[in-house]
């Protein structure tokens, strides 16, 4: 009898362990987003929550968390950036008070993590999505034909991750913050350094031609080749995309 009892206990414990293991299976992020894109359109969705404005808790995460204002993005202690998003509540049922948190991955810069968040939010929430770059990304996902016809560069001026980032389409972008950008006036004497990005000449609507952009402490200096530009005179701010 004792042997039979021990055998039944072992079988029951094994079934419990196996059931726990089955519950731990996590659906890949790509599959989750594809499911929302295919099936979620017919579901009633709530407007995405605004979220907390306080950001990451003080003393938690990386040193640049206090200056990061991207939605769904935070920094690890070792410097990497992570992105995550909550699925709409309606996906788990009308009686659910909290939604499932979806891990989107680890990234080298805050801007890359913010782009990943925007793509996921656009798929899950559609027109109700709250995006980090609502105008620049066109709803979080750039169509192939738009990416081919656009060669714009964005400059991100916060401390989170200045520099060029790569998207899935192979296009390089530099994210910018319009409020923190200044255009230099008397920078024609500065030699080029390793920070500079050399691009083909860009023709603007005003007739100027720009072929060099210098990244220096979050400031964007460009040197026009027009004869009408005189040293120290400067030019008006121009924050639109440059089309190559």
UniProtKB/Swiss-Prot annotation:
Residues 1-25 are annotated as: Disordered. GO terms for biological process: abscisic acid-activated signaling pathway; cellular response to heat; positive regulation of DNA-templated transcription; response to salt stress; response to water deprivation. Induction: By abscisic acid (ABA) treatment. Induced by salt, heat and drought stresses. A motif (Nuclear localization signal) lies at residues 20-46. Keywords: Abscisic acid signaling pathway, Activator, DNA-binding, Nucleus, Stress response, Transcription, Transcription regulation. GO terms for molecular function: DNA-binding transcription factor activity; transcription cis-regulatory region binding. Its main location: nucleus. Pfam families: AP2. InterPro entries: AP2/ERF_dom, AP2/ERF_dom_sf, DNA-bd_dom_sf. It is found in: Nucleus. The keyword Cytoplasm does not apply. Expressed in xylem tissues, stigma, anthers and region where sepals and petals attach the peduncle. The keyword Cytoplasm does not apply. Transcriptional activator that binds specifically to the DNA sequence 5'-[AG]CCGAC-3'. Binding to the C-repeat/DRE element mediates abscisic acid-inducible transcription. Involved in the regulation of plant development and tolerance to abiotic stresses. This is Dehydration-responsive element-binding protein 2E. It comes from Arabidopsis thaliana. The lineage of its organism: Eukaryota, Viridiplantae, Streptophyta, Embryophyta, Tracheophyta.
């Amino acid at each position: 009898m004792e042997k039979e009892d021990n055998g039944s206990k072992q079988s029951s414990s094994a079934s419990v362990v196996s059931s726990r293991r089955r519950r731990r299976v996590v659906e890949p992020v790509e599959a989750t987003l594809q499911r929302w894109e295919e099936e979620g359109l017919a579901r009633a969705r709530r407007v995405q929550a605004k979220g907390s404005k306080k950001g990451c808790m003080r003393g938690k995460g990386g040193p640049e968390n206090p200056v990061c204002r991207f939605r769904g993005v935070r920094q690890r202690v070792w410097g990497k950036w992570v992105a995550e998003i909550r699925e709409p509540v309606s996906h788990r049922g009308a009686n659910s008070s909290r939604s499932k948190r979806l891990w989107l991955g680890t990234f080298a810069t805050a801007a890359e993590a913010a782009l990943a968040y925007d793509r996921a939010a656009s798929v899950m929430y559609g027109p109700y999505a709250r995006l980090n770059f609502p105008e620049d990304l066109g709803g979080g996902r750039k169509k192939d034909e738009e990416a081919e016809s656009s060669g714009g560069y964005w400059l991100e001026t916060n401390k989170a991750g200045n520099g060029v980032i790569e998207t899935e389409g192979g296009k390089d972008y530099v994210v910018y913050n319009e409020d923190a950008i200044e255009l230099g006036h008397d920078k024609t004497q500065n030699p080029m350094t390793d920070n500079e990005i050399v691009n083909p000449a860009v023709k603007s609507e005003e007739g100027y031609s720009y072929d060099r952009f210098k990244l220096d402490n979050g400031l964007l200096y460009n040197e026009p080749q027009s004869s009408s530009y005189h040293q120290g005179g400067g030019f008006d701010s121009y924050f639109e995309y440059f089309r190559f």
